[in-house]
């Protein structure tokens, strides 16, 4: 917009961070998540732009695996976006495309119930747009036995600033 351009002109050397941190520096910053001394088997993350997951994949060791849970419906296009950010061809990851709950910022009663029960059981808030969908998916994969005996790191990517608006819009308490 013109207003944004006017503000940028008043700054010496502005650096504009794209939505979702979806650029090479955002991906680089996320490499630190998986590039640690701790040896997790699997990294789990919600996906919006895919840059967090791409960074995690770039930082992984060869024996590690990553699973992303897109918040968007019909998000298979993220496969190509994520591949564009990868340092090398890596097949140790995939997207779980069936946990979007009707799409971005959409909800279903079972997701709301899950968020509420998760808060009561664990004392950790989940946002309904991204993180709750990924956590729900993780619990589902654990239930069906596909992650048995795996050391898992779930990355809570935040999003809590949107909870009050979501509660107001849908007349629910998370």
Would you name each region that the model predicts?
Residues 25-102, 155-174:
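Glycine-rich phosphate/pyrophosphate-binding loop at beta-loop-alpha junctions
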Residues 41, 149-150:
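Nucleotide donor/acceptor-binding cores
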Residues 99, 103-149:
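Active-site-adjacent helical/loop segments in soluble small-molecule enzymes
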Residues 9-13, 35-39, 58-62, 84-91, ...:
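Generic secondary-structure signature for well-ordered alpha-helical cores
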Residues 21, 130, 158-159:
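A broadly conserved detector of short glycine/acidic/proline-rich loop/turn motifs that flank catalytic sites
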């Amino acid at each position: 917009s013109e207003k944004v351009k006017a503000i940028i002109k008043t700054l010496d050397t502005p650096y504009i961070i794209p939505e979702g941190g979806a650029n090479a520096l955002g991906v680089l910053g996320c490499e630190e998540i998986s590039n640690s001394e701790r040896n997790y088997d699997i990294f789990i993350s919600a996906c919006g732009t895919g840059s967090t997951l791409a960074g995690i994949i770039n930082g992984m060791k060869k024996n590690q695996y990553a699973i992303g849970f897109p918040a968007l419906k019909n998000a298979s296009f993220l496969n190509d976006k994520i591949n564009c950010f990868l340092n090398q061809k890596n097949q140790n990851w995939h997207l779980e495309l069936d946990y979007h709950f009707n799409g971005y910022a959409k909800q279903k009663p079972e997701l709301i119930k899950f968020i509420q029960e998760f808060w009561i059981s664990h004392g950790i808030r989940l946002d309904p747009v991204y993180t709750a969908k990924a956590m729900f998916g993780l619990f589902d994969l654990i239930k069906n036995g596909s992650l048995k005996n795996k050391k898992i790191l779930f990355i809570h990517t935040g999003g809590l600033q949107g909870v009050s608006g979501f509660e107001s819009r849908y007349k629910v308490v998370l």
